[in-house]
Amino acid sequence: TINLDYKTTRLKYSGILNPFQLGYSGRNGITYRQQLRFSKTFKKDRQLRFRPEVGFVFKRKELFFKFEGDWEYLPEKQGALSLSLGNTNQGYSSKIMNEINEQLKDSTFNFENLDLEYFKHYYIELKNQIELFNGFQMTTGISYHRRIPTRKSAIDPGDGVTEIINENYHDFIPTIGFSYTPRQYYWMDGYRKEYLYSYYPTISIEFGRAIPSVWKSSGNYGRVEADIHQSIYLGLSRRFNYHISGGLYTAQKSTYFADYRYFTRHNFPESWGGDDFGGVFHQLGSVWFNASDKYVQAHAMYESPFMLFQLFKPEATKHIISERFYLSQLWMPVKPSYTEIGYGFGNHIFNVAAFVGFDKLKYDGIGFKFAFELFQ
């Protein structure tokens, strides 16, 4: 890892051959990524930030990249203009799913057995965030999405469906979102306002509207998502986090891809510092993240330095800094009840966790995740 801090310029690079950038999860297998962080501070603490990263998922042989930059033009109001471009998870639309199922009802094919990773997803997004008053932020943005088939389908499920799964899709989506944390405590680091904590939850809502006929865009639909989360500190390094969110697609006048902000697959295991709320499904199959036009999810995480290891291996507590219990629940029309229970432990060097999934209370698999904490 390379760290450079010279006057108003900072540079951090993970290094080309750095084993601490390796990770593992049951769904994705071994992962490896590279991260670079650059920042330049100007007068009145205005700051330019550049954060490119690239990662590879060995199990699926997929390369992910993201180039992101911010210009913090009004640090006392957390005003920042951001530009991001990259690729995300492959997927397909709910309409494609419905069409294929209709055509395959009388065939030997089964939806669950098909290879459903039909479309690569590339995007570019420009957004602006600013605080209107203490704890209340507004975010506006525009994004453009391009989805192209990973390959021309060899399956011929019926008239019309082959064309649907071999077509390119483009979406132009303006968004507006609001986030509010009542009685938000903060401090001023020079001109820069930094949030500290609040005894109340953070409530967020975002509206998006796909507009057709803009740069070849064909999407014509709406998306609404809401989220509430909070981290409650209980003293002695103990805390309880919860995270509840839901979303739906409205006014569906075109083919659309169920691409949610809060309900998405994570490809790279995060360090515990980047996993504050535990709001992630680790064992849920990738097909389900695109399978519905609406969802509701809830996650809870309890963290404490003395739990199972204190009971069964007291001598190990000097090496284990903290333990965590996870509980997650998902509802979608196509999957009315999915539950995950997890347990993890970690220290300043690594974190590891195990998760068990249940579909309608029936065992649905077990998996593990591992990530290094050093040099993150």
Specify the residue positions occupied by each region the protein language model found.
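Exposed, low-structure sequence patches enriched in small/polar residues
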Residues: 1-376
